[in-house]
């Protein structure tokens, strides 16, 4: 049985959805017997957009929008293929972007 280090990076606009997904991943990994480090909270990225309200005049009247991207990192230092298969079968919400990086093995 080959052990590997697995990094799971989660991104979402909704932090409640992101925290619930991280909790589910940690729960499944611990049930499988893996040691879990995290979730590590990364600084949120805020993208701001400012547009004119009218189509061609009145520059003083503007609308402001922002998108907040939240990130979490979960690492499994000694994971085997059974844990990886359990994580791959996990159903996560549509608003969560998942990147899995496997190192070693």
UniProtKB/Swiss-Prot annotation:
Give the matching Pfam families. Ribosomal_S10 (PF00338)
Write one Gene Ontology MF term: structural constituent of ribosome
Q: What is the superkingdom listed in this entry's lineage?
A: Bacteria
Q: Name one GO biological process term.
A: translation
Q: Which GO terms describe its cellular component?
A: ribonucleoprotein complex; ribosome
Keyword annotations = Ribonucleoprotein, Ribosomal protein
Is the keyword Ribosomal protein in the record?
yes
Q: Which SMART domains match?
A: Ribosomal_S10 (SM01403)
Q: What does this protein do?
A: Involved in the binding of tRNA to the ribosomes.
Assembly, per entry? Part of the 30S ribosomal subunit.
What's this protein's name? Answer: Small ribosomal subunit protein uS10
Please report the organism this UniProt entry assigns to the protein: Anaplasma marginale (strain Florida)
Q: Which gene encodes it?
A: rpsJ
């Amino acid at each position: 049985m080959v052990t590997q280090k697995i990094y799971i990076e989660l991104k979402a606009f909704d932090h409640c959805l992101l925290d619930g997904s991280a909790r589910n991943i940690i729960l499944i990994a611990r049930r499988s017997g893996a040691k879990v480090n995290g979730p590590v909270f990364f600084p949120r990225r805020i993208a701001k957009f400012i547009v004119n309200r009218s189509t061609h005049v009145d520059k003083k009247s503007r609308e402001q929008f922002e998108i907040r991207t939240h990130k979490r990192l979960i690492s499994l230092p000694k994971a085997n293929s059974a844990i990886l298969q359990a994580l791959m079968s996990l159903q996560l919400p549509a608003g969560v972007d998942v990147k899995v990086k496997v190192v070693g093995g």
